[in-house]
Amino acid sequence: MYAWPASEVPALPGRGRDLRIHDTATGGPLTLDPGPVARIYVCGITPYDATHMGHAATYNAFDLVQRVWLDTKRQVHYVQNVTDIDDPLLERAVANGDDWTALAERETTLFREDMTALRMLPPRHYIGAVEAIPGIVPLVERLRDAGAAYELEGDIYFSVESDPSFGGVSGLDAEAMRLLSAERGGDPDRPGKKNPLDPMLWLAARPGEPSWDGGSLGRGRPGWHIECVAIALDHLGMGFDVQGGGSDLAFPHHEMGASHAQVLTGERPFAKAYVHAGMVALDGEKMSKSKGNLVFVSALRRDGVDPAAIRLALLAHHYREDWEWTDGVLQEAQERLARWRAAVSRPDGPPADALLDEIRTALANDLDAPSALAAVDRWASAQASEGGTDEGAPGLVSRAVDALLGVAL
């Protein structure tokens, strides 16, 4: 599977600061020191109802991670998956009278277009779950053969008790895990499971559903968590720098994935930091495909909204914050974009070296984009009220906003 084209990242003078970011597993800040090549895995979409504002907010957060790393003169090895086979996708295809493969391809194409418009830097590897199946099957077989997985009516389950550190990512107690498992794709009430929390590794073929050759597992398709594990291990290996996604992925998805990988390899951690973006609401409820309360990037673009304004609307909220999308949020972003563009269109202005430092400092501090935006606002206000004589300032501001915030002025 291919990703989307990369937008150019302008060069900036000097070097950015190392990123200090909130780690879900420890519950506190962690200063990342990735070495010359930073490694990040971000869980991708299930390709139906793409791209809603919750998606966009999540990928915006991890785009900032990439930009901060690039500003420290590091290379970034970014991997993202596409969950192009899953129960919700199949259910939507049936409900729409659509072919599931056509639905997945159409929505993935739309997602790429939205990411391009929003100037999200693409992953180096963009991998669909279906194309990863040949690498998934041997991992499930290894877990089964090691006694870390078991069969139940043809399905293969992972035993969470095989990982002594299970629970270390989310920090939840067993009852909270059970409730979230039921809400988020698990089957804690299925009779015969060794532990209600045990997740599916391999779903045996069902009549009328797609299936693939699973070797000694029989025909079927993979469970959700093992898909990301297989892709991450193949392209990044153990101990990569950041595992990212929305906060609703901390459990069960990232918890289970960490256990799968750690039992498979005998090493830990799977990722050095688990980083989660907040949820975006509409009319007081979390934006979700199941509820249908969605605002789509593509719909806003069709209505003539500048993608740069959409991105500024996302940046106005700290990535870990839960917030609500409103018309007012978008209007404020559009007005900010107009002020910034007017400010950088002038031939000179107030010196901007300090502004570049402020943006870098804000983003290095747990991706504090709102503080970065406030710094640019102050420069733009000074430009509007007093002006300046630094001929290089408008260009530096424009390049800094593009390189570090992903907004083209």
Curated annotation (Swiss-Prot):
One record GO biological process: mycothiol biosynthetic process
Name the chemical reaction catalysed here: 1D-myo-inositol 2-amino-2-deoxy-alpha-D-glucopyranoside + L-cysteine + ATP = 1D-myo-inositol 2-(L-cysteinylamino)-2-deoxy-alpha-D-glucopyranoside + AMP + diphosphate + H(+)
Q: For the motif 'ERGGDP' region, give the residue ranges.
A: 183-188
Keywords assigned by UniProt? ATP-binding, Ligase, Metal-binding, Nucleotide-binding, Zinc
Protein function: Catalyzes the ATP-dependent condensation of GlcN-Ins and L-cysteine to form L-Cys-GlcN-Ins.
Of which family is this protein a member?
Belongs to the class-I aminoacyl-tRNA synthetase family. MshC subfamily.
UniProt name for this protein? L-cysteine:1D-myo-inositol 2-amino-2-deoxy-alpha-D-glucopyranoside ligase
Gene of origin?
mshC
